[in-house]
Amino acid sequence: MSSTKLEDSLSRRNWSSASELNETQEPFLNPTDYDDEEFLRYLWREYLHPKEYEWVLIAGYIIVFVVALIGNVLVCVAVWKNHHMRTVTNYFIVNLSLADVLVTITCLPATLVVDITETWFFGQSLCKVIPYLQTVSVSVSVLTLSCIALDRWYAICHPLMFKSTAKRARNSIVVIWIVSCIIMIPQAIVMECSSMLPGLANKTTLFTVCDEHWGGEVYPKMYHICFFLVTYMAPLCLMILAYLQIFRKLWCRQIPGTSSVVQRKWKQQQPVSQPRGSGQQSKARISAVAAEIKQIRARRKTARMLMVVLLVFAICYLPISILNVLKRVFGMFTHTEDRETVYAWFTFSHWLVYANSAANPIIYNFLSGKFREEFKAAFSCCLGVHHRQGDRLARGRTSTESRKSLTTQISNFDNVSKLSEHVVLTSISTLPAANGAGPLQNWYLQQGVPSSLLSTWLEV
């Protein structure tokens, strides 16, 4: 809201179109020379009533509002109802959803009204509150994404340096909101209402502007440069570096601090009987292998989802960030000739900011199996489809049962008991891709493990 002010929209209009009322081609700058009612009808017809392309914008905002509100509420409900989903990362995701809900409810409707009617109808108090809440939401989103990246970086790249806990995550969330509320106070202080038509200021609120009033040229430039660096460029660069290291660790190197992938050598079959308990030890080692591979797959899926969330955030906030800097710092768009294009860019950049709030739940649905199951359960409940309690419990035990089933199948092979007691560490880089073969896969094939079972086991 604060990034695109009403004068940008007003500047796109050609006031000489008032020649319908005035036969001269001079700009219509003195509305008091005409009948007030006639002038207000003219304003409604030419400026306030939505044009054809603006109806498309309205439809886009409605879709974003519904998806963002329902999707982010479902994210919060899913984590609240399921204790197994209350992880450190999911706590931060819930905080991100809360910020999206806040900006969707408080800021999206006001932004749409201003973009269409070019008027601030909400008074002086909300002129300070709504832009302030929007900037707070942006700050919360950026800091939350930064905390997620930092948490994943420590957990995967330096697990022995820092231990993430749910309590620390909750404390971090409180700090995020406090810091965001404090650093955005200047935004609330400088926002004021003013009329673009002083002659009708006492008769109508049309073309009332909610904009920044700094009282100087240096302060807004300094503020918006700092705002761009603190809320976009610097965090984005740091998060990109963090995820690059995470990518190298998960896809190219061994994950330090985790249990290593277990590999065993064949042993010559001895005529003597095996010691008591050796079969159970073999089963335990096989279970360790399954657990390790499952952990790798889970971490890769989580990292992939978070990288997509960061990418979408960077894309959605890039246009408005650039336009803000160009307008507030370099003074562009004040006397531009192509005002329709400028207006289109600002309105589209507004829509992208809110579309980011709607995109996050969609990303969770496609890239997180747990969130997808909870979303399906919620929609099924709303549609009146009732599942047995056992079906719901089965979803919570899916990962455990699949691992047990996998261990049981492998332990049934006769050659499992011939596995050596010797355990060696192997790098995660030896793990095969889904359609490739590596040293670990070749070794299992030599032990007689069927390729069909192995492809399912080692899928990443």
Curated annotation (Swiss-Prot):
GO terms for cellular component: nucleoplasm; plasma membrane. Residues 76-88, 151-170, 244-304, 367-460 are cytoplasmic. Residues 33-49 are annotated as: Required for response to orexin-A. One of its GO terms (biological process) is regulation of cytosolic calcium ion concentration. Belongs to the G-protein coupled receptor 1 family. It is a multi-pass membrane protein. SUPFAM superfamilies: Family A G protein-coupled receptor-like. This is Orexin receptor type 2. It is found in: Cell membrane. InterPro entries: GPCR_Rhodpsn, GPCR_Rhodpsn_7TM, Orexin_rcpt, Orexin_rcpt_2. The chain crosses the membrane at residues 55-75, 89-110, 128-150, 171-191, 223-243, 305-326, 343-366. Keywords: Cell membrane, Disulfide bond, G-protein coupled receptor, Glycoprotein, Membrane, Receptor, Transducer, Transmembrane, Transmembrane helix. Nonselective, high-affinity receptor for both orexin-A and orexin-B neuropeptides. Triggers an increase in cytoplasmic Ca(2+) levels in response to orexin-A binding. Glycans are attached at residues 14, 22, 202. The keyword Cell cycle does not apply. It comes from the Eukaryota. Widely expressed. Isoform 2 not detected in skeletal muscle and kidney. PROSITE patterns: G_PROTEIN_RECEP_F1_1, G_PROTEIN_RECEP_F1_2. The lineage of its organism: Eukaryota, Metazoa, Chordata, Craniata, Vertebrata. GO terms for molecular function: orexin receptor activity; peptide hormone binding. Pfam families: 7tm_1 (PF00001), Orexin_rec2 (PF03827). PANTHER family: G PROTEIN-COUPLED RECEPTOR 15-LIKE, LEUCOKININ RECEPTOR-RELATED. The gene is Hcrtr2. Disulfide bonds join 127-210. The keyword Transmembrane applies. The record marks 44 as: Important for responses to orexin.
